[in-house]
């Protein structure tokens, strides 16, 4: 089943107009959460025991924790981006080399940003933030770029793939808040308008080539260089210093909990291998199979926002 939504942006009027035939509402959040079996009380007890025994718990989250906030993931059966469309995420090399590709990316990102940036943490994000405040969570590593952990108050946090809230200059490294860049887009494109369909996990939406052609893209205010979101695009690599930092946190931990990730991407999977080699107990909470199910002592197929708030971190 194909599922989508539509928003119309009118830059001259400075507002979004929801398509009444497919409104974006709280009901749409469930569109991106794959089906899962009812909670198994025995599995809940097993996870509770796992958390109770953990003294230096490291948690790694993926896109599955944010689907309940209305942000789709890529790989979930029937509801992920790959299942709903033949579109694929932008490649790092293409973005760096091609001005038309950068123009298309930023036009789509400009249209999608107001909705993407408005998403809020769900009970799973708040639960992990509470665990940190109570001293249960030693470190949190997220593969997501949506800033929802930060919005929930998490501070002992590594954003493995960066964050869409920030923009970097590819030439001089100048960092700009994404909201500030949105204002520059509006100044450069006062009469530009487009209708967007479908939201991607990185805030991208889908526009036609004709819609994109007239869109003006700002450059770095410091050096005139090209701007890029402070995220790791597909085909790029995570900063080695960040990788080393996370490896150290894993080695300092006494247990690892994976939340909402299939671990198909090696950038996150490698830390599971490190934990396994260190003989740390590994628990996985994810709807559907993961790359590391055979390494885990506990696997739960449940919604993150339904299960995590049931766990007592004390």
From Swiss-Prot:
> Where is NAD(+) bound in this sequence?
62-82, 143-146, 260-262, 286-288, 304
Q: Does the keyword Hydrolase belong to this entry?
A: no
**SUPFAM superfamilies, alphabetized:** DHS-like NAD/FAD-binding domain
Recorded hits in InterPro entries, A to Z, give:
DHS-like_NAD/FAD-binding_dom, NAD-dep_sirtuin_deacylases, Sirtuin, Sirtuin_cat_small_dom_sf, Sirtuin_class_II, Ssirtuin_cat_dom
Main location, first listed in the record: mitochondrion
State the tissue distribution: Detected in vascular smooth muscle and striated muscle. Detected in insulin-producing beta-cells in pancreas islets of Langerhans (at protein level). Widely expressed. Weakly expressed in leukocytes and fetal thymus.
Q: Note how many cofactor molecules are bound and how.
A: Binds 1 zinc ion per subunit.
State any single GO MF term.
Answer: NAD+ poly-ADP-ribosyltransferase activity
Question: One Pfam annotation, family name?
Answer: SIR2
Arranged from A to Z, the UniProt key words for this protein are:
DNA damage, Glycosyltransferase, Metal-binding, Mitochondrion, NAD, Nucleotidyltransferase, Transferase, Transit peptide, Tumor suppressor, Zinc
Enzyme Commission designation = 2.3.1.-, 2.4.2.-, 2.3.1.286
> Which Gene3D superfamilies is this protein grouped with?
SIR2/SIRT2 'Small Domain, TPP-binding domain
Which amino acid positions bind Zn(2+), per UniProt? 169, 172, 220, 223
Where's the active site on this chain? 161 (proton acceptor)
Coiled-coil stretches noted in the UniProt entry, renumbered to this chain: none
Cofactor(s) named in the record:
Zn(2+)
PANTHER family found in the cross-reference section: NAD-DEPENDENT PROTEIN DEACYLASE SIRTUIN-5, MITOCHONDRIAL-RELATED (PTHR11085:SF10)
The identity of this protein, by name, is NAD-dependent protein lipoamidase sirtuin-4, mitochondrial
Instruction: Identify the species of origin.
Output: Homo sapiens (Human)
């Amino acid at each position: 089943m194909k599922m989508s939504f539509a928003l119309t942006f009118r830059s001259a009027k400075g507002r979004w107009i929801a398509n009444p035939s497919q409104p974006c509402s709280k009901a749409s959040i469930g569109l991106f959460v794959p089906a899962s079996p009812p909670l198994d009380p025995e599995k809940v007890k097993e996870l509770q025991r796992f958390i109770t025994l953990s003294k230096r718990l490291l948690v790694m989250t993926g896109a599955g924790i944010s689907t309940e906030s209305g942000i789709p993931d890529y790989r979930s059966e029937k509801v992920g981006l790959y299942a709903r469309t033949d579109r694929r995420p932008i490649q790092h090399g293409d973005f760096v080399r091609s001005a038309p590709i950068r123009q298309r990316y930023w036009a789509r990102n400009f249209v999608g940003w107001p909705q993407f940036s408005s998403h809020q943490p769900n009970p799973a994000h708040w639960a992990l933030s509470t665990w940190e405040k109570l001293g249960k969570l030693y470190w949190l590593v997220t593969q997501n770029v949506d800033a929802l952990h930060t919005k929930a108050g998490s501070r002992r946090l590594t954003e493995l793939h960066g964050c869409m809230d920030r923009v970097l200059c590819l030439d001089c490294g100048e960092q700009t808040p994404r909201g500030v860049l949105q204002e520059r887009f509006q100044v450069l494109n006062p009469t530009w308008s487009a209708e967007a369909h479908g939201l991607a996990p990185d805030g991208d939406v889908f526009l036609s080539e004709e819609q994109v052609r007239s869109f003006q893209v700002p450059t770095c205010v410091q050096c005139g260089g090209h701007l890029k979101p402070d995220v790791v695009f597909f085909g790029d690599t995570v900063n080695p210093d960040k990788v080393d930092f996370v490896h150290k946190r894993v080695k300092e931990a006494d247990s690892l909990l994976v939340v909402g990730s299939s671990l198909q991407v090696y950038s996150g999977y490698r830390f599971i291998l490190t934990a396994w080699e260190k003989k740390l107990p590994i628990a996985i909470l994810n709807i559907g199979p993961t790359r590391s199910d055979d390494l885990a002592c506990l696997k739960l197929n449940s919604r993150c926002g339904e299960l995590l708030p049931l766990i007592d971190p004390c």
